[in-house]
Amino acid sequence: KKYIALVLVAVLVLGIFTGCGNKGNKETESQTDEKATESVNSAENNTEDSTQNSTENQNVADTEQLTTENGQESSVLACPSVNGKLHVEGSKLVDQNNNEVQLRGVSTHGLAWYPQYVTNDCFATLKSFGANVVRLAMYTYESGGYCTDGDRQRLETLVQNGVQYALNNDMYVIIDWHVLNEGNPNRYSDVAKTFFAKMAQQYASYNNVIYEICNEPCNGATWGDVKFYASEVIPSIRSYDKDAVILIGTPNWSQDVDEAVKDPVTGYDNIMYTLHFYAATHKEDLQNKLKSAADAGLPIFVSEFGICSADG
């Protein structure tokens, strides 16, 4: 797989091989295959040896020192038992000792549609592949969505189980409020505030939980809309969890990171901004946009990427 690597920027890449919605020209998300993802927070392409067996991946990958193409040391793959709770320093994702870290793993598809993959065995298998993070994609609007006709208790239980399975396997986990077809995250902001307050209260003492408060603002949602939403939801998390990393989606299906550069969220630490990239659809213009934002010092977290087209 190929991914974007930029100098001096903490980038988490979660690559998804099924469509998760149209960015720029997509209309709906495919509800077919589970998404595979990969994350990076490195200065150059990861050159780790692909010949390691699964046992070595499980026992070594979490603390493995990565190198860049010129042989210089880069960030390390992280695990909660060694690296503890993560935070943001400048544009970088770092561990409890301020060492740059790398996360890479998978994102589920909609929890309501594919609950059978939220098991300890699945997480253990992902761990054996070298994954150290799982993104729990909980749709909010679509069929079975948390804010529409979904069973909220069932969805919360799936999230809670996922957090525990990640902890069991020494992995990080992202609780993803998967805004998509509703477009503007403010539509269900009151529900989001209640949900994230509940999650943060439950997991404030955990060192492996990251919150993603809006997957893909779209359909005309502006950065002003997203920033207002963030100002409403972030306090619900910070009331209980003072320093967890919080990810904020950007307009245009999380492509317009340049908007966040011009007017970032202020008053809170450990904030990152998401960018989504699909190689068959998004070309050099999006890479240039990412590079410009990174050069400006924006903490960027690529919470979805795929080698397919944006519409699956």
Locate predicted features:
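Bacterial N-terminal signal peptides that target proteins for export
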Residues: 1-7
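Repetitive helical segments and hydrophobic/amphipathic motifs
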Residues: 10-11
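N-terminal, intrinsically disordered, polar/charged segments of Gram-positive cell-envelope systems
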Residues: 24-79
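Extracellular glycoside hydrolase catalytic/binding regions
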Residues: 85-86, 110, 115, 132, ...
